[in-house]
Amino acid sequence: MHLSPQEKDKLLIVTAALLAERRLNRGVKLNHPEAMAWLSFLVLEGARDGQTVAELMQAGTTWLRRDQVMEGVPELVEEVQIEAVFPDGTKLVTLHDPIR
């Protein structure tokens, strides 16, 4: 199987996001890389499911709460930008202050 660098990056995001999901389900607080992977994964999957950029930007502020991440993580994650594939092409999705 031959994967492009972008495809490899997406697989790494998925792997880290699955770990983050397991930790969230166990009540373990996420660190910075896990939080970034989880938010990125939800954007990528939402785009594949047909949600719009605006819908993802709005929903992105509800996916993680301060009590689900380690201390200091919300301040580190002021903005998340990820390119996602939508039915009408690739677009940049930006989440502003996603952990509230």
UniProtKB/Swiss-Prot annotation:
Keyword Cytoplasm on entry: yes
Xref: Gene3D superfamilies: Urease, gamma-like subunit (3.30.280.10)
Entry-linked CDD domains: Urease_gamma (cd00390)
Compartment(s) where it occurs, according to its Swiss-Prot or TrEMBL record: Cytoplasm
Catalytic activity line of the entry: urea + 2 H2O + H(+) = hydrogencarbonate + 2 NH4(+)
GO BP, sorted A to Z: urea catabolic process
Keyword line: Cytoplasm, Hydrolase
EC number: 3.5.1.5
Pfam families to which the protein is assigned, alphabetical: Urease_gamma (PF00547)
SUPFAM superfamilies: Urease, gamma-subunit (SSF54111)
One GO CC annotation: cytoplasm
UniProt GO molecular function: nickel cation binding; urease activity
PANTHER family assigned to the protein according to its UniProt record, in alphabetical order: UREASE
Family: Belongs to the urease gamma subunit family.
Protein name: Urease subunit gamma
Annotated source species: Synechococcus sp. (strain CC9902)
Gene: ureA
